[in-house]
């Protein structure tokens, strides 16, 4: 065998091994893909049985798996990081987030990006920590559950996390309602499966329906639209039953008529825009634009807001029988997460 043939043979073997490894990976990801049903019951832990008195306070906060504080950036936003450099970074952020919840008491807390067992957050069970710290009833719905995410370099690896609702109220039932998935195979095998976490609380013969949400981020825009449409269909159906509806979280879309935070970064991620006409008559957004609710993670946060891309993408939707007293963004200056919490105060009418 000539030298040239030996070289070609070695190259062929290497290519065959690479193809085989890719095939094995695709088979593994396909077999282990998280495939939740359209509606699934969610367990509620805790013993609190408090009933609503008509006055309700809800706090929503995307905690960024306690891995996206002021010193972190994120590769999908134009940064370079996949996870914090040290486990202590996550622990410090998580402690700060927990203290924020204790210092701002609410009847219900909608948490997004709460990890349970993920490489990116050093396998810390953040949901368990926050539930134990607050002493509230807890319900968790996974929206990201992958045995292995094989990108970028270094790889994300295992992810288990999702939506966490903490509440003092006695929850009659909780469910995970699946939202449309915009991704196709094989990308879908290790990507997010967005959902609503719905908690039902009895109130004067009807239900207070608490809806925790986190809509699509890194899609072409069609996923956000489809998920928003399904969200509104669900909310209006609940209101037509006579229920009180409070939906809140990270919409990954800016709210109508907010111009305080113009686009200064046109190269990286940008949110969608919610349609000003999407709400039926009597419904309303509850949003506070006096402070930003989110920052772009193209780099660590320097504190210079004029040079930081800011957004208002976190807030609430209220049914007509829920009266808005106030809504306030708690400006923590992105100390522990890339989002600021938002506090809602309402009356059930």
Region roles according to the model:
Residues 3-136, 140-151, 155-160, 349:
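N-terminal, active-site-proximal structural segment of metallo-dependent hydrolase catalytic domains
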Residues 48-58, 70, 159, 163-173, ...:
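Beta-strand-turn-beta hairpins that frame and shape the catalytic cleft
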Residues 56-63, 93-123, 166, 199, ...:
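Active-site beta-strand/loop signature of hydrolases that rely on acidic residues for catalysis
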Residues 65-66, 115-118, 144-148, 171-172, ...:
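Solvent-exposed loop/turn segments at secondary-structure junctions
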Residues 80-86, 114-116, 179-188, 214-222:
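Surface-exposed cleft-lining segments at the edges of enzyme active sites
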Residues 153-154, 186-188, 301-307, 331-335:
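Short proline/glycine-enriched turn/loop segments at secondary-structure junctions
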Residues 219-320:
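Metal-dependent phosphoesterases centered on the DNase I-like endonuclease/exonuclease/phosphatase
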Residues 322-333:
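Low-complexity, intrinsically disordered Gly/Pro/Thr-rich segments
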